[in-house]
Regions:
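A short, acidic/glycine-rich surface segment
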Residues: 56-63, 132-134
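Short, flexible turn/loop "capping" segments at secondary-structure junctions
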Residues: 1, 65-70
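Residues at or immediately preceding the N-termini of alpha-helices
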Residues: 14, 82-83
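Vicinal oxygen chelate
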Residues: 89-135
Length: 135
């Protein structure tokens, strides 16, 4: 069995968050979706669990910060090309995401950072290992 990752993030509006991730081209798994949570399928081994604040508090009693003003983590997802990075960034912005900085372009690596509707920052990254510096 492959190792999977489930990234659990608190959201203020579950329906809006689901629509946002659907606009990026991701599907949801109805088997793990109800009125308090939604499973977003990123790949065969990567899932984002969108949890209402109340549901999230079942897992942690720590206060949920305002991710628009604080940050707890950056989540990075690889893409197959620079164009694919720009395409998902454009979809995220159109769906209401917020660009966090200018694109990073190191020649061998290109990335964009977009905050979702709840302020969770996702970096979309393309790496061309053939262009990776040898030293």
């Amino acid at each position: 069995m492959s190792t999977s990752i489930f990234v659990n993030v608190p959201v203020r509006d579950l329906a809006a968050a689901m629509a946002y991730y659907k606009a990026l081209g991701f599907e949801h798994n109805p088997q793990f979706t109800d009125e308090t949570a939604a499973s977003i399928v990123i790949s065969d081994t990567i899932y984002v669990m969108l949890l209402t604040h109340e549901k999230f508090q079942d897992f942690s009693k720590k206060p949920i910060p305002d991710f628009n003003n604080e940050i707890g983590a950056l989540y990075a997802l690889s893409r197959d090309s620079r164009e694919a990075v720009d395409a998902i960034a454009a979809a995220a912005l159109k769906a209401g995401g917020t660009e966090q900085r200018d694109p990073d372009d190191y020649g061998f690596m290109y990335s964009r950072a977009i905050a979702d509707l709840d302020g969770h920052v996702w970096e979309y990254v393309y790496m061309d290992m053939a262009q990776f510096p040898s030293e």
